[in-house]
């Protein structure tokens, strides 16, 4: 199969799931077990998190390592010096993908997150399917289609790399604010305190710092910046990277809106001027 085949399946999956996310709270995290529809069928949040996120880098590496079309793309790329440059571009894009998922699949759930709420098996299966299709489409694209057939300006590439780096760092920074807050909340465990709310086996408090001054889910917003930067670096013809970015928006925006509503409902003193995910707008 070619990258376009997996990309078509990814499009069908995202377009099919998006309407569901508008009306159903994805049963994981602070919104777990809040619907009778998902009252049973939960698995360990930490184990599920690691396994479902590992699918993306593993399928990505499989696509690159075992694709027979890789060598056949190289002769059409020009002389040796041009080929070296093009291969370096592929390596940078692959590095962006793998570095993100190293943090997402291993560092965050195993080293940083103090507690992880259970997740419903439907969330796990959906994430596995998305990560499989996304990992295969992007991995195969890098070795089959060659983003370098449509040269990207140096300025665009470096702007994209800078945005990716800022988004990646911002995502981790705001995640760590939430982790630190949860650690301190779990130690103080005072459900009668209006600034502390219990959900499942975790205690939550109002987060502050960084972009939390403006939005409830800055970690999501930073991840959008991260993958938009990756798309810029890949070039306008890099459709799998564009769809990864678009999928992040379609699948995370409803979650951010529901999380914002949860904060406003649970905390009487929640900042009224704080938006859900985009500063000053939404």
From Swiss-Prot:
InterPro entries: 3-oxo-5-alpha-steroid_4-DH, 3-oxo-5_a-steroid_4-DH_C, SRD5A/TECR
Keyword Transmembrane helix belongs to the record: yes
Pfam families per the UniProt record, alphabetical: Steroid_dh (PF02544)
Entry membrane topology: Multi-pass membrane protein
GO CC terms of this entry: endoplasmic reticulum; endoplasmic reticulum membrane
The UniProt record lists the keyword Membrane: yes
Location of this chain's protein in the cell: Endoplasmic reticulum membrane
Annotated TM spans: 9-29, 43-63, 123-143, 158-178, 232-252
GO-annotated molecular function: 3-oxo-5-alpha-steroid 4-dehydrogenase activity; oxidoreductase activity
Main location: endoplasmic reticulum
Superkingdom field: Eukaryota
Protein family according to the UniProt entry: Belongs to the steroid 5-alpha reductase family.
Identification of the protein by name: Uncharacterized protein C9.08c
Organism: Schizosaccharomyces pombe (strain 972 / ATCC 24843)
């Amino acid at each position: 199969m070619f990258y376009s085949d997996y990309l078509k399946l990814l499009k069908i999956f995202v377009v099919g799931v998006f309407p569901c996310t508008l009306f159903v709270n994805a049963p994981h995290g602070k919104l777990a077990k809040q619907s009778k529809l998902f009252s049973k069928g939960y698995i360990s949040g930490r184990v599920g998190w690691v396994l479902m996120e590992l699918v993306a880098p593993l399928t990505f590496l499989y696509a690159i390592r075992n694709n027979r079309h890789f060598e056949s793309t190289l002769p059409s790329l020009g002389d040796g010096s041009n080929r070296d440059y093009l291969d370096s571009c592929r390596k940078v894009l692959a590095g962006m993908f793998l570095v993100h998922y190293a943090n997402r699949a291993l560092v965050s759930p195993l080293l940083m997150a103090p507690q992880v709420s259970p997740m419903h098996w439907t969330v796990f299966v959906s994430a596995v399917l998305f990560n499989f299709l996304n990992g295969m489409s992007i991995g195969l694209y890098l070795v089959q289609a060659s983003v370098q057939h449509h040269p990207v300006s140096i300025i665009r590439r470096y702007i994209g790399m800078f945005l990716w780096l800022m988004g990646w760092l911002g995502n981790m920074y705001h995640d760590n604010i939430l982790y630190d807050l949860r650690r301190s909340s779990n130690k103080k465990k005072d459900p009668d305190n209006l600034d502390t709310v219990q959900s499942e086996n975790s205690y939550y408090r109002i987060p502050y710092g960084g972009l939390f001054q403006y939005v409830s889910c800055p970690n999501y917003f930073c991840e959008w910046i991260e993958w938009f930067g990756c798309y810029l670096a890949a070039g306008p013809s890099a459709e799998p990277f564009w769809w990864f970015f678009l999928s992040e928006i379609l699948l995370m925006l409803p979650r951010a809106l529901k999380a914002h509503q949860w904060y406003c409902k649970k905390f009487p003193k929640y900042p009224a001027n704080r938006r859900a995910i985009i500063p000053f707008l939404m």
